[in-house]
A protein has these predicted regions:
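Single, function-defining residue in the core of a domain
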Residues: 1-49, 75-78, 85-88, 104-108, ...
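Short edge-strand/loop segments of extracellular domains
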Residues: 53
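Major-groove recognition helix of helix-turn-helix-like DNA-binding domains
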Residues: 59-78
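A short, well-structured juxtamembrane/interface segment
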Residues: 92-98
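Noncatalytic carbohydrate-binding groove/subsite architecture in carbohydrate-active enzymes
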Residues: 101
Length: 451
């Protein structure tokens, strides 16, 4: 990342100094990025590791190691705006037209999903972010921030991100998704993959209005009228508005069938039985119900669309990259005040994006799928390059330890409390599996007339 990019972010945020300091704003941004890169280290150790990069940026008095108090005050003085501007400059899919795994049906594969980050317990953080409800209605646990991002599946590059306190108003994933849609980051030529949390009409219609195509998993109980059956086994349907859905539900309870097609978003309904056959063990079959705005089965056959949905897991992998490998497993963010938390999250996103950019660059040099480039090896190489001032070695080191082609494996997902996690005997990770997709036509007859 060129230093000029940081200088532009500082200028765009209006953080230029009125006088020269030991730690000017550009140096503070570098230091905050270092805190995200070396998250488990204290301020003093981070400053020592980055001394070779910070000393040329020091003020006219020359460089000496600042105290932790001076570093904390410098962070507060800079605020979150420069890091937000820097992330905006770095954000993007990182995929070219020939990047393996980045495209499907002529569209850029992206995924939309959220996660949470724990922040330190302080009065300021509680006031800004709130705390999750505890037992017997009492507030308990750590305050949390909900982060939602739009990620390119092929490279795990972060296209956009938004976050808010979990207990704040309008902090649900659906509200945050509408915020990303309003920013203009969802555009025609994208195929957005999302889970069942985004299958309601208000959020799906907002996302579709951007011109991007959608592929969303829906609940088995969600009402989707079958208007007609298509040659590939999928069906024409409509994601009804809440008012239309209620009108048809009331009519069905009275034993009536309304003749008109409900108002809403036209979609294709795809129901598929996914059979996973491990090399040793018992096969298991799961029903997957999807809706998509790819309405033409000739250009997007149902079986291929259903197989494409598996790429949504890439955003889960990207959150593992951020929370486990970059921040550290189970770690809190550092700051005890909201502005510092906001600054840290933008810095973490910048570090993740820079690491994914290094992965994408390394993969491009050998026409490899970016999945073959290890995130952890690339991140360690970047850390080592910064501390030894040998910039440029991260790409070659990442290429020297390629991952094998990704295998199909089965690891059933569990949602457990902390106590249950300690007690659960989780099934072992299986070896290579075979996945079979069978498209099924919905058994229920349509309650609507028409072709």
């Amino acid at each position: 990342m060129p230093l000029a990019l940081i200088e532009q972010a500082v200028a765009a945020a209006g953080c230029q100094e009125q006088r020269r300091r030991l730690l000017p704003a550009v140096a503070v941004v570098v230091f905050v990025l270092g805190c995200a890169l070396f998250h488990g280290e204290g301020y003093g150790e981070v400053a020592r590791k980055l001394a070779g990069w910070l000393s040329p940026l020091a003020g006219p008095g020359g460089w000496h190691l600042p105290g932790t108090g001076a570093l904390a005050r410098a962070r507060r003085r800079a605020g979150p705006a420069p890091l937000r501007m820097l992330f905006a400059a770095l954000a993007g899919p990182l995929a070219g037209g020939d990047t393996p795994g980045a495209w499907a049906f002529g569209r850029l594969l992206t995924a939309l999903d959220g996660t949470t980050l724990d922040v330190p317990y302080s009065a300021a953080n509680i006031a800004a972010f709130g705390a999750p409800p505890g037992a017997e209605g009492r507030a308990g646990g750590w305050p949390q921030v909900r982060l939602l991002s739009l990620t390119a599946c092929g490279t795990r590059g972060i296209i956009d991100a938004v976050f808010r306190g979990c207990r704040a108003r309008c902090s649900s994933e659906q509200h945050l998704a509408r915020t990303i849609a309003a920013r203009g980051q969802l555009i025609p030529g994208m195929l957005v993959l999302a889970d069942r949390n985004f299958s309601g009409y208000p959020v799906a219609a907002t996302l579709a209005a951007t011109g991007a195509d959608l592929l969303i998993r829906v609940k088995s109980s969600q009402w989707l009228p079958v208007l007609s059956v298509l040659p590939d086994g999928s069906c024409r349907s409509v994601l009804a508005t809440p008012r239309a859905r209620q009108r048809h539900a009331n009519a069905r309870r009275r034993g009536q069938i309304l003749a008109e097609t409900p108002a809403g978003l036209p979609v294709r309904l795809i129901e598929a039985d996914i059979t996973i056959t491990p090399a040793s063990g018992t096969p298991r079959t799961q029903r997957c119900r999807l809706i998509t705005t790819l309405l033409d089965p000739a250009t997007a056959p149902a079986a291929q669309v259903a197989a494409c949905y598996a790429q949504r897991w890439e955003i889960e992998t990207s959150y593992r990259d951020l929370k486990t490998f970059t921040r550290g497993p189970g770690q809190l963010l550092r700051s005890r005040h909201p502005a510092g938390i906001t600054q840290e999250i933008w810095a973490l996103l910048c570090i993740c994006q820079l690491t994914h950019a290094a992965r994408a660059t390394a993969a491009r040099t050998r026409a490899l799928d970016p999945d073959r480039i290890s995130y952890t090896i690339t991140l360690r190489a970047i850390r080592r390059a910064l501390t030894t001032s040998t910039a440029g070695s991260a790409t070659s080191e990442a290429l020297s330890a390629l991952l094998p082609p990704r295998r199909r494996r089965s690891y059933p997902r569990l949602s457990l409390t902390t106590t249950a996690k300690r007690r659960a005997a989780r099934a072992p990770l299986t070896g290579t599996t075979t996945c079979t997709i069978t498209i099924t036509t919905p058994a229920q007859a349509s309650d609507l007339p028409g072709p």
